[in-house]
């Protein structure tokens, strides 16, 4: 976030409790300091339980000075607002682990998944932009591979799609992009997507 000069954090939405998706919790403290306010954090009960185990000092009544300061909000099975944006939580599966995908306006975001239920496909219908994980070329037990991600992109039919959660096994993005349809590209650090 520092490299991309992010100055304000309106909210932080957790998709699931794996370490590579929650370890940045400590980075909130910089936004607490600069903006002089708590950061709104959104998580399911399952993710909240994990956050409390991994970061107990954030949730203590008597906090040590300088720990991340948050307002924790529970994600339920219904839309919720973060500032002026309305988010729709969408269930997906990461092998046996429930993960929350999100839709905001015409933008849908699906990471760490290998199964999308029909209910979620219905919620994704009409998305203009889709971000979806595509770990590698070969099948994987808990992530979509490139072929599966492209099939989902075809089904959702967004005008633009980005592949995320890519491993080195997929190859260099410049090489992968050359193989993709014109409306599909690899996501990259610093990518900005504007939603309404």
Regions found by a protein language model. Give the residues of each.
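Active-site metal-binding motif and surrounding structural segment of the metallo-beta-lactamase
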Residues: 1-43, 127-128
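Core dinuclear metal-dependent hydrolase active-site scaffold
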Residues: 2-4, 69-122, 189-196
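Short, glycine/charged-enriched secondary-structure capping and boundary segments
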Residues: 3-6, 26-30, 55-57, 102-103, ...
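Active-site neighborhood of phospho(di)ester-bond hydrolases with catalytic His/Asp-centered motifs
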Residues: 10-20, 43-44, 107-113, 130-135, ...
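Active-site neighborhood of divalent metal-dependent phosphoester bond hydrolases
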Residues: 35-39, 47-72
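Conserved beta-strand segments of alpha/beta enzyme cores
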Residues: 40, 69-71, 86, 160, ...
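Binuclear metal-ion centers of metallo-dependent hydrolases, dominated by the metallo-beta-lactamase
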Residues: 117-196
């Amino acid at each position: 976030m520092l490299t991309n000069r992010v100055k304000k954090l309106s909210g932080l939405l957790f998709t699931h409790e794996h370490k590579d998706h929650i370890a940045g919790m400590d980075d909130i403290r910089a936004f607490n300091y600069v903006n002089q306010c708590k950061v709104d954090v959104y998580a399911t009960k399952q993710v909240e339980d994990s956050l409390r185990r991994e970061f107990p000092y954030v949730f203590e009544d008597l906090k040590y000075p300088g720990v991340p300061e948050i307002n924790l909000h529970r994600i339920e099975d219904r839309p919720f607002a973060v500032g002026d944006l309305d988010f729709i939580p969408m269930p997906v599966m990461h092998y046996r682990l429930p993960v929350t995908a999100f839709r905001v306006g015409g933008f849908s975001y699906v990471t760490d998944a290998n199964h999308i239920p029909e209910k979620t496909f219905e919620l994704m219908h009409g998305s203009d932009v889709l971000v979806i994980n595509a770990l590698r070329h070969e099948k994987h037990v808990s992530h979509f591979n490139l072929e599966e991600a492209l099939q989902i992109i075809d089904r959702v039919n967004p005008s633009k799609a980005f592949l995320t959660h890519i491993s080195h096994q997929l190859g260099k993005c410049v090489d992968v992009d050359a193989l993709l349809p014109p409306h599909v590209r690899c996501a990259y650090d610093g990518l900005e997507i504007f939603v309404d």
